Amino acid sequence: MAEDDLCSLFFKLKVEDVTSSDELARHMKNASNERKPLIEPGENQSMDIDEEGGSVGHGLLYLYVDCPTMMLCFYGGSLPYNWMQGALLTNLPPYQHDVTLDEVNRGLRQASGFFGYADPMRSAYFAAFSFPGRVIKLNEQMELTSTKGKCLTFDPYASTQLRFEPGELVRHGECKFAIG
């Protein structure tokens, strides 16, 4: 099946030598900075700014889905409907060694009201996006409990515009949350 082949290829695509969320953030920031001249409009070019509030910088935002959905999104150039009004993203980095995948699923399920996050495999993959100005920060917060019992808070964001430009996708891969 083509989806399985794509998933096995996708599984092999990894960011080398990244062992922590700080390293991942640095790596993605560098990659984003390298791509910036390629994706920013040049002189006399128009820039498509969403009507809902103009350009707002949120840094990197992460989408969590399963591998087949991720592949369909990438080849289709659009985000999945994983929230009642569009796509739900968060500033929770995918390499949090002190948060379990089950806890991440619980937080995503609570923030989105989306039943699909009942299965941990539904969020085993991530895509990091840099969306200049076309996401809105939701009023809720995603509260997770770390493996050490510490409360961690992350912000959920929403995008009702599901199409994305190739330059907005910064990185993608398999999540590395804590086991157990």
Curated annotation (Swiss-Prot):
TM region positions: none
Keywords: Cytokinin biosynthesis, Glycosidase, Hydrolase
UniProt key word Hydrolase: yes
GO BP terms: carbohydrate metabolic process; cytokinin biosynthetic process
InterPro entries tied to this protein: Glyco_hydro_41
GO MF annotation: an example: beta-glucosidase activity
Source domain of life: Eukaryota
The keyword Cell membrane is assigned to this record: no
EC number(s) from the headed UniProt entry: 3.2.1.-
Function: Hydrolyzes cytokinin glucosides thus liberating free cytokinins.
Protein name as catalogued: Cytokinin-beta-glucosidase 2
Annotated source species: Panax ginseng
Gene designation: ROLC2
